[in-house]
């Protein structure tokens, strides 16, 4: 289990992390001792310890059965980076709809907190649908580069660290910068829309947004947002 993944991701979406660590995660190389990407079980929460949403905000900050909108966006970013990273992702029961355990770390013998409250699902169904769309992308033909059986070469990645810890991460399916098709992951963990200067390899290609909030143009990323583009 990659505690590294859990801690680095949560720190990143809360504004305390480093973009270089997230780039390593997106390459499947955050845990340096691994010889294969599938040796990492990537997770944000498990059956014990705190629910990941309780580590982003206090349950006392919830209103009308859901956390603040900013916190939901932070959680979406964390879930997106989890499911779009090489390795084996693990999602705990209820995590897909932001199940809270009321900030209690050790819920051993706390059936009242461990039970899944499906009434809450009605309030956070949009997050559940986001999780479903991420899983669908990961399992698709376009998502094969998130399901690696072996590490890709450094020449198959181009990563740009932009302002405010933002990231442009390019995956080249072939070991050539003249690829006809590339994947572009854009990440903005800040509270403001940012613009990232993209590498020349992105110029002149047809753009298709696979997942994420739409923006005025490619390279402009809304606040607390993850986008995946296919460029052909």
Please provide the spans of the model-predicted regions.
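Carbohydrate-interacting/catalytic domains
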Residues: 69-72, 83-232
């Amino acid at each position: 289990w990659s505690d590294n993944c859990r801690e680095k991701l949560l720190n990143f979406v809360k504004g305390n992390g480093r973009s270089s660590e997230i780039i390593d995660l997106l390459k499947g190389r955050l845990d340096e001792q691994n010889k294969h990407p599938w040796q990492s079980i990537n997770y944000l929460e498990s059956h014990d310890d705190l629910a990941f949403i309780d580590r982003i905000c206090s349950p006392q900050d919830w209103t009308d059965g859901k956390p603040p909108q900013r916190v939901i966006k932070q959680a979406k970013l964390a879930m997106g980076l989890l499911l779009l990273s090489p390795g084996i992702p693990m999602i705990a029961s209820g995590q897909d709809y932001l199940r809270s355990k009321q900030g209690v770390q050790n819920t051993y013998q706390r059936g009242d907190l461990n039970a899944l409250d499906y009434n809450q699902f009605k309030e956070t169904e949009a997050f559940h649908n986001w999780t479903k769309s991420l899983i669908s992308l990961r399992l698709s033909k376009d998502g094969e580069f998130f399901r690696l059986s072996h590490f890709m070469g450094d020449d198959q990645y181009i990563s740009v660290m932009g302002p405010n810890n933002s990231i442009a991460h390019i995956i080249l399916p072939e070991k050539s910068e003249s690829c006809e098709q590339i994947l572009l992951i854009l990440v903005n963990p800040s509270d403001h829309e940012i613009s990232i200067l993209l590498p020349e390899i992105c110029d002149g290609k047809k753009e298709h947004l696979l997942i994420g909030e739409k923006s005025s143009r490619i390279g402009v990323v809304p606040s607390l947002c993850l986008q995946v583009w296919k460029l052909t």
